[in-house]
Amino acid sequence: MTQDEMKKAAAWAALKYVEKDSIVGVGTGSTVNHFIDALGTIKADIEGAVSSSEASTAKLKALGIPVYDLNSVDRLSVYVDGADEINGQMDMIKGGGAALTREKIVAAVADKFICIVDNTKEVAILGEFPLPVEVIPMARSYVARELVKLGGDPVYREGVVTDNGNVILDVHNMKIMEPKKLEAQINGIVGVVTNGLFAHRGADVLLVGTPDGVKTVTA
């Protein structure tokens, strides 16, 4: 099984968590693209979706799935998204695709977070994948200095502007032993919109595509 086939298997397995006639929270990224394809096969059974990025919105609309503004929705039964890394406590690093802020907002609204990954994303300790931090542009240098004080090596992601008009600093060389604490510390820096640690709102269900099929882990 190729890595992409494992992503696809995990994505399709998430369909069973989608409630009939519901509005589904949809994340961003290569694994989620497979989930959107899967969602397209049952679009008659759902009301529509709330999307965490312009890219996912475009793909949903292309398949004829109605996309709602989050402000017009009271609740989401599920939010389905991938991760760049996930540990055994269901804490994640997300934001490789620069959609972390909207992903975090949609995840906060959902009753259940379903994380879909291939088996290369499972780690014992978070931090091998650089931690994305979304920053107001004028605060970039200040935030970078503060991240250095926390032990990180921030690198400006050249040429990337988020859907919110902000910039991304990718923080390298961090062994993240206390994800909840670090998430709060970074979010406390003036000029930070949010960071890619999803520890305060981790995953409820993890679906992992493996060569032997899909493994299910629950929090």
From Swiss-Prot:
The keyword Nucleus does not apply. Substrate binds at residues 28-31, 81-84, 94-97, 121. Keywords: Isomerase. It is an enzyme of class 5 (isomerase). It catalyses: aldehydo-D-ribose 5-phosphate = D-ribulose 5-phosphate. Pathway: Carbohydrate degradation; pentose phosphate pathway; D-ribose 5-phosphate from D-ribulose 5-phosphate (non-oxidative stage): step 1/1. NCBIfam families: PRK00702.1, rpiA. Homodimer. Belongs to the ribose 5-phosphate isomerase family. This is Ribose-5-phosphate isomerase A. It comes from Shewanella amazonensis (strain ATCC BAA-1098 / SB2B).
